[in-house]
Design a protein with these regions (language model features):
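Hydrophobic transmembrane alpha-helices and immediately adjacent juxtamembrane helices
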Residues: 1-294
Length: 294
């Protein structure tokens, strides 16, 4: 399939006035392009690797080992309770990994595809959005070691795991908004390419290692002080970092049998929608400068 249509769509997105719904319809219509770009990147990522697709399994396992070592050696994050430590870590890691992979890959997507952008007429949002699909593939592969861990520890996921798709749905607008924002800003500020790999691991550690719910905190981190005990601090944190309530709810539903914590989820959803709108507006405002890439 050719990625370059015969002629531009009449509903071209290269307009100065952002129109979110109109652009959403256009992107939905060009969904095949996004899937094709994602498939191309996945094939290119593993094509020349000796271990090939196995890296999709090894990468989260390596991250898990590092996270496990950190949790065992930093007293304030010593995890205990009835839930196996490694499961606690890994479920949080997979959930955050979907977001982290999308931002890590999407942030550089416009710069990396400047040659294709110069001769294509489909919406430029397709490039960063395709990275979300690529990250989803990696996260899906990472569930294979998770199934093995459940079997080894004789620990079955709870029935409340069925809530997980809802939590991921809340994560989607956050990923879309932030990947559009970061990828467009990087076109103007290339230094941000060096900052993202430094910031993302720090955000991951804070998000994965600090539960929001006090009851879950007692199960997962019994020896640590409940930092987010103040209501206003927790609310601001959930709004600014929607991944916190998402990771928190996924982990508590899968491992502890808790239902949705609606107070934190609603804050996370509101934050996600704000990121979506801001990311889209900034992307469209800066889009006129993308020609500088060519």
């Amino acid at each position: 399939m050719s990625l370059v249509p015969d002629e531009p769509s009449e509903e071209s997105l290269y307009q100065h006035k952002p129109e979110l719904l109109r652009s959403a319809r256009e992107l939905f219509r060009r969904g095949e392009v996004i899937f094709t770009l994602a498939e191309r990147d996945i094939r290119a990522q593993y094509k020349q690797a000796v271990l090939g697709i196995a890296w999709a399994l090894l990468t989260p396992l390596i991250s898990l080992v590092l996270l496990f070592i950190l949790a065992k050696n930093v007293k304030s994050f010593s995890i205990g309770g009835n839930v196996p430590t490694i499961l606690t870590m890994y479920v949080g890691l997979i959930t955050f990994g979907l977001f982290g992979g999308a931002i890590g890959g999407g942030s550089n997507s416009l710069v990396a595809n400047k040659a294709l952008m110069a001769k294509s007429h489909f919406p430029r949002e397709c490039f960063p959005l395709s990275q979300i699909l690529g990250s989803a593939f990696t996260s899906l592969m990472a569930t294979v070691p998770l199934a093995i861990l459940f079997t080894v520890h004789g620990f079955a996921p709870k029935l409340t795991s069925l809530w997980a798709p809802l939590y991921v749905a809340i994560e989607i607008p956050f990923m879309i908004g932030l990947v559009l924002l970061v990828s467009s800003v990087i076109v103007q500020m290339r230094d941000l390419q060096q900052i993202i790999p430094i910031v993302m691991p720090l955000v991951m550690l804070i998000t994965v290692l600090e539960p929001l719910n006090q009851e879950m905190h007692k199960h997962l981190v019994p020896n640590a002080r409940f930092v987010l005990g103040h209501g206003w601090l927790r609310d601001v944190y959930c709004f600014v970092n929607p991944m916190a309530p998402i990771v928190d709810n996924v982990r508590s539903s899968v491992l502890l049998g808790f239902g949705p914590q609606w107070s934190t989820l609603i804050l996370g959803l509101c934050g996600s929608l704000v990121y979506l709108v801001v990311g889209f507006v900034v992307f469209k405002k800066l889009e006129v400068n993308f020609a500088d890439l060519t």
